[in-house]
Amino acid sequence: MNLSNRFAYKANVSQFIKSSDEEVLGDLTDQYRHRQLEQQQINAWRYQIKELKRVLINFPDATLLLEFEIPRIGKRVDAILIHNGSILVLEYKVGAKSYDASSIDQACDYALDLKNFHKASHHLNIVPILIATDAPNKNSIVELGLDGIAKPILANSENLLNVLNLVSNSLPKSTTDTDLWVNSTYHPTPTIVEAAQALYKGHKVEEISRSDAGAINLTKTCSHVSKIIDDAKANKKKAICLITGAPGAGKSLAGLNIATERMRYLENEHAVFLSGNGPLVDVLREALVLDQLAENEFLPKDQKVKRKVAEQKASAFIQNIHHFRDDNLASSEPPVEKVVIFDEAQRAWNKDQASSFMKRKRGQDDFAMSEPDFLLSVMNRHQDWCVVVCLIGGGQEINTGEAGITEWITALKENYKNWDIHFSNEIFKSDYALSQEWLEDQGALNLYPENDLHLAVSLRSFRAEKLSDFIGALIAGEGSKAKEIKQHLTNYPIYVTRDLDKAKNTLKNLARGSERIGLVASSNAIRLKPEGIYVKGQIDPTQWFLKAKSDIRSSYYLEDVATEFDVQGLEIDWVGVCWDANFRVEDGKWNAYNFSGSKWQSVHDLEKRKYIANSYRVLLTRGRQGVVIFVPKGDNSDLTRQQVFYDGIFDYLKSCGIQEV
């Protein structure tokens, strides 16, 4: 997408100064004609227009944009000044008597977003300036980072002109084609939380996703699924779509988009996004609720949304798969949803796990179905049509009893042969544990291989598409291969240290603006406790992922550690991975251990070994921008924390090309 329609006002500064205040104000208010505008906002704009006319008198050739939208963040920058080849981001706080931390972060966030996702800004210097109009003077200095983003500069009404002159004189001068800059493409890679918020508000998936040649276009996959849904509806058919993809390739984003598209399509065509990942569901729902409540600021009193109403609406869009199952267990009626999207469908329980759970937890002694079989039976209650969309990740199973994709095919073969099965041939790769020969042996099924149902490139880290390959080689014990791949991760920092305080300080120094940092560890990393890392303490993922820097429950405080079960499917900017002796290098290869009672026990069962390895794969792929790994030094006076346990891990990680802090 381009940003040409993403601002309320654009003009050369000399033209802006000649325009009447009311003319400029008219353009600003027109952008918000569908919303209730508070008088306070209109007054703030009047003030900004007068102030900008006063201070920009020395910059007649610069270009000014007002109310410039940053789609990924869902907010608008008060003003952008394009001058001498640099971008000045101006954020006003009219009437503010101090420079509060959240406002400083906000200005920095705008600069970071432009630098990372707006193509024409990649190689330009960007200076965020926070203008707290009534705050005291602060010493100003232009400090550019290696990527060309300056540390936020603090200004007030009195010294803004001096600050602008300082910035102008401090930066190298060049020329920028303003029209090219404005029309340049914007390719964000939002977090799953940001994506859900944007789609929920009605943004299109192409507005919030990359569309460059390096990534398969998500719109292609979503459009293909939409055609399958239309065909099923028109021809009274039942179909299942199996969408595969690399970790972070955008499967959940595709699923959320399909859910929102079909929710809006017709009132009698309900769609729901289902996940068995409790923390993911809780975090996404709470994020949507908070977003809706934040909108209240712009609504008249009689239109403000109450929390309970916002929660009900969010719950209809995103549901826990186990709640969906229980609701439909109590009824034999078809569900209201005609389209259901199952996130991480390979995690659905096999017959033994599902039956055991239903007997123990639900008192259902006669339940004898796998989870895929039961969920398909629920959707099969529809007399006319329905579509099931399965989002399938490869090589990520971390729980006992997760059946993989074969359980879905088996259920279709045994009970629902009339269903159409749409999939990509990528599903036969080893990561998905489904062989073409096995599928062909299942007899007559309505199979439709379609390439558009595979998402090939990881979008999770906008800095490092090769990250999943690197982590895969590292976890597989292929150190030399990992080291070779690491050479291509030049813009994705990965560090290792034996000092936890150093790890924490590194995370704090790497993060800018409101970039989120946090500590994670394996759920069986029991012997990190002497380091102050206690994995058995329950965290609230909604607080950990969503609370602000000032809240001790947030990940920012680096006090509460999240495990693979808390963070699966979610991500933060900079992650600190705390490594314990449950996955250690011995005689040149990885060995898995489980802590039981008061000692480590070697894990021989191949499935359980795989779960432990994959827990570290999950942890190491949670950082959008970089990773800091902490490996304890150990203590030879403690049999459970022998130094040799940890030295092998540390040495191996360094041999993979990971730099020590």
Locations of regions flagged by a protein language model:
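C-terminal accessory regions
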Residues: 387, 557-661
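Accessory nucleic-acid engagement/destabilization modules that flank
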Residues: 1-189
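Hydrophobic anchor at the beta1->P-loop junction of P-loop NTPases
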Residues: 243
